[in-house]
Amino acid sequence: MNQLFKNKKGVTMAEIIMAALLLSLIFLAVSSLYVASQKFYLGSSQKVIIGYEAQYAIQHIYKNTMRAIGDETSSPSTSGIQLPNTANPSTERLDIRINANDPVTSSNYSTVTIYSYYKSGNTLIFDNGVTQESLIPKVTVTAVNFTKTTNALTGYITAYYSDPAKALTFYFSCYPRQASFN
């Protein structure tokens, strides 16, 4: 009987075990690469969502800041951009005086609407005097800050999508148009 198998070519049990081990190592490497790529994809997707939401809010603030109308040389109540908490130069609320008249004349100059941005709960609210809406509905806002220096409005928005440890902060600055009529 030994004579039958003596010259036959075949695969030994040791070779089969080695092949199985090599295949399992390759499978583990490929699966760990897949898991890492999925984790990277999910993290990147969350950052993109936060970025889009914050970008929309910042553009909204910028657009209305550029429409602000007021007198920076008079009392603070006529300034185009107002931070209601005057004791603190940085605040979570921003009021913008908008004149919707077209064209703006000396007779309708003082007819203004106040647009407000403020943090309420976990969102950034825009109030146009008639309705209120959340500017960032898809993400959780953890911090909002507005600071007014001489002729600039600066601030930041901090938000996260699903994991508070992965919060992102977006900074912005606006230089509203200044005009003086004598």
Task: Show where each model-derived region lies.
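Compositionally biased, intrinsically disordered low-complexity segments
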Residues: 1, 61, 84, 107, ...
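Aliphatic-rich helix starts adjacent to a transmembrane/signal segment
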Residues: 2-4, 8-66
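Acidic/proline-rich low-complexity IDRs
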Residues: 3, 32, 80-82, 93, ...
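Exposed loop/turn and edge beta-strand positions of beta-sandwich/beta-sheet ligand-binding modules
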Residues: 16, 111, 168
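Short linear sequence elements within intrinsically disordered, low-complexity coil regions
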Residues: 39, 45-46, 61, 120-123, ...
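Type IV pilin-like appendage domain
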Residues: 72-150
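Short linear sequence signals and composition-biased patches located at protein termini or domain-edge surfaces
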Residues: 132-182
